[in-house]
Curated annotation (Swiss-Prot):
It catalyses: an acyl phosphate + H2O = a carboxylate + phosphate + H(+). Signal peptide: none annotated. Residues 13-101 form the Acylphosphatase-like domain. The lineage of its organism: Archaea, Thermoproteota, Thermoprotei, Desulfurococcales, Desulfurococcaceae. This is Acylphosphatase. The active site is at 28, 46. Its EC number is 3.6.1.7. Keywords: Hydrolase. One of its GO terms (molecular function) is acylphosphatase activity. It is an enzyme of class 3 (hydrolase). SUPFAM superfamilies: Acylphosphatase/BLUF domain-like.
Amino acid sequence: MEGVPSVRDSLVRARILVRGVVQGVFFRASMREEALRLGLSGWVRNLPDGESVEAVVEGRGDAVERIICWCLRGPPAARVRELRVELEPYKGEFRGFEIRY
């Protein structure tokens, strides 16, 4: 609809869970690089199960959509089996994008 802002133009926050062969394949470093390229802030970390990566990203809706699409494939050695995304209220709490341990 004309005159109605879309989610793509809004500031949004998403919690992303990726499962599969996503640890030990440079997923976190590659995601950080992609997030910074897209102007997103937040963090990414491995989960202790050995097969999952969790991330929280904030930024423009179109950039968040792009990082979600990127997560479907990940870096070349990754094999994504499952992707879950939860939208959360934007908080603006991050400066930059970090890898958490």
